Amino acid sequence: DQRFGPWRDTHLEMRGPVVQAVQLVFLEDWFWAANQIPDLTWDTQPEERNQIAAIIPTGPADPADSWQLIVAEAANSARRKLWIASPYFVPDEGVLTALQAASIRGVDVRILLPERADHLLVWLSAFSYYEQSIPYGIRLLRYHRGFLHQKVMLIDDRLAAGGTANLDNRSFRLNFEITG
């Protein structure tokens, strides 16, 4: 990209039964947009490893604001570390408070953000949240080698999440997102 340099994204490869959950989300979204159901291959092979995975679709029809609750619960349940990477940092009060509380408890809370803005207004909005994060010991880090577009979270080296949901109110309540 001429303006930003290389984009930093993270991709997930999923196998086994969890793929059907992703297909179902795709099917629901496709039907919502096109009012038709495409043919899908539903055959998935069971994964040999004993991995636990879940798919979390969120969006404006989600009455529970699930992504917001998941991020807040990740902060509340973390004991050692909570590392998040997101291109946008405009959390609501509940998520910001959970991040602050985690840091006060001694959790290593780090949020990796892009150095350059792709949406200036959102980038500028984040600065007020920096001022509410740094005094609590939350480490805000900048990615300099291009544009950081990944949306990932690591909790205590035992749980990880990655997908399309950002750390902002649009992803909490408005956008259709999927995280695994």
Regions found by a protein language model. Give the residues of each.
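Charged, low-complexity intrinsically disordered terminal segments
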Residues: 1-180
